[in-house]
Amino acid sequence: MRLLIAAMSGIACSVLFNPAMGSESCASRSDAMALKTAAVQQQLMVAAFMCHDTNAYNLFVHTYQTDLQESDASLKSYFVHRLGRRGQAAYDTYKTKVANLAGLSQARNDKAFCGAANRLFAEALESPASLSSFVEDAPSPPGFRNVCVNVPTEVRSRMRLHIAQARSSGSR
């Protein structure tokens, strides 16, 4: 089972980071947010069916309908921009693979999966003001953990400085 899950994760990541996708090797922050939003939505959709809680999913979709539609349009644009005519197929494949990975996660531990899904639904509906803040704070769904995000140079420099300071203060 672990081998199957690892293979599925690899397939999902290869859809995202195929060298043929162009010179940009990483997603922008907004593209990464669209990728993660789709992954979280697919995870919640699978959870709704597997855990028999379609009402929670329907409320989630209704609450964030406009944001979800905008994010989905951005996701399609991401794939079309990178892959041209093959973009729509890659978009469909990505969403299918993410849903399949969520289903595999559920198959490994039904009780834990449904408990985590219930907590995720509660968090999503607790503060409906911002889908993006919910998605940012949500745990990364299976298959999403290896997404590479372009970080501006000045942010990278500040991150390196912060890490160096943390290391030096920890070694005292």
Give the location of each predicted region.
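Bacterial N-terminal signal peptides that target proteins for export
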Residues: 1-8
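Short, intrinsically disordered, charge-biased short linear motifs at domain edges
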Residues: 13-15, 36-37, 132-138
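N-terminal signal peptide c-region/cleavage motif recognized by signal peptidases
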Residues: 17-19
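Immediate post-signal-peptide N-terminus of mature secreted/exported proteins
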Residues: 23-59
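Compact alpha-helical subdomains of small soluble proteins
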Residues: 64-172
